[in-house]
Amino acid sequence: MKEVIFAENAPKPIGPYSQAIKAGNFLFIAGQIPIDPKTGEIVKGDIKAQTRQVLENIKAILEAAGYSLTDVVKVTVYLKDMNDFAKMNEVYAEYFGESKPARAAVEVSRLPKDVLIEIEAIAYKE
């Protein structure tokens, strides 16, 4: 059985997709970009500011589904510029301290709304 998850405290999807889908014990979170859910605007600033907003959006979706950051098992990070990798990691480590999920980081030529970062995640909970 699958369930569509919608978090009020996360940005509304900007296309024909769901914020997240719960399938069994898994939660599949769609790629999140640094949109402030209160204003609907892209967070201006450097990679650190954008990474923080993306992770706050993911956290809000997790919580709406009854999950937490410690339940995240896999993350894919899409970066506009791999030179931002170290700075992104500084913020990322604040969110995933001891509970580090498996992860891939990929440089891409362009992201929606010309943001610097997009992150998607998969969580699992017994």
Curated annotation (Swiss-Prot):
Top EC category = hydrolase
Q: Which InterPro entries match?
A: RidA (IPR006056), RidA_CS (IPR019897), RutC-like_sf (IPR035959), YjgF/YER057c/UK114 (IPR006175)
Q: In which pathway does it act?
A: Amino-acid biosynthesis; L-isoleucine biosynthesis; 2-oxobutanoate from L-threonine
Site described as Important for catalytic activity at high pH, located at E118
Report the catalytic activity. Answer: 2-iminobutanoate + H2O = 2-oxobutanoate + NH4(+); 2-iminopropanoate + H2O = pyruvate + NH4(+)
Which organism does this record belong to?
Answer: Pyrococcus furiosus (strain ATCC 43587 / DSM 3638 / JCM 8422 / Vc1)
Single GO cellular component annotation? Answer: cytosol
Q: Which GO BP terms, alphabetically?
A: isoleucine biosynthetic process; response to toxic substance
- The name of this protein is 2-iminobutanoate/2-iminopropanoate deaminase
Principal subcellular localisation of the protein: cytoplasm
Which NCBIfam families does the record associate with it? Rid family detoxifying hydrolase (TIGR00004)
Q: Which GO terms describe its molecular function?
A: 2-iminobutanoate deaminase activity; 2-iminopropanoate deaminase activity
- Alphabetically list the UniProt keywords: Amino-acid biosynthesis, Branched-chain amino acid biosynthesis, Cytoplasm, Detoxification, Hydrolase, Isoleucine biosynthesis
Give the record's family classification.
Answer: Belongs to the RutC family.
**Gene3D superfamilies with a match to the protein in the record:** RutC-like (3.30.1330.40)
